[in-house]
Amino acid sequence: MVEMNAWGGKLVKILTVALSAKNHCFAYSFWLRLASKPNPLYYVAKWMHYRLSRKYGIQISPSMKLGYGLYIGHGVAIVINSGTIIGNNCNISQCLTIGTNHNTPAVIGDNVYIGPGVCIVEDVRIGNNVTIGAGSVVVKDLPDNATVAGVPAKVLNYNNPGRYITNKYCVNS
């Protein structure tokens, strides 16, 4: 404990947790955040981000606009276009693709749950408190508080918005 405090205290403790994390999704999120802005660990973070991206097949660019409270449920086969904007408290699952061919990426609101196997295509706006069911293909804008599913995704109801978002990161506006 004394050695940790001598080498930077809390930062070293957090790094120790990130390096030895049994949950690779947490480790990936940690190094993604550190690789997004210049800091004393920037080059180590870039390397770790690259290494974990290759190992788990996750492609999330550190330059992407990403809100607080990102939760990666099962971190494999995730591809997100670097121009995508993701709001606060977004939960993403495995086999997710958010892509574009015409440089018009998606904008995802706050408190959004994206289920496994979802494809979000082109210039769509996803509102706040939206739940997207497994295997959905989103090709149109989604309103706030909607639960959607299907190919193409259709609004099923407006009951219980954001019900799968737990442990929200409190953001002071």
Regions found by a protein language model. Give the residues of each.
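Left-handed beta-helix
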Residues: 56, 62, 67-68, 73-82, ...
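Terminal amphipathic alpha-helical/low-complexity segments used for targeting or macromolecular assembly
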Residues: 1-57, 161-173
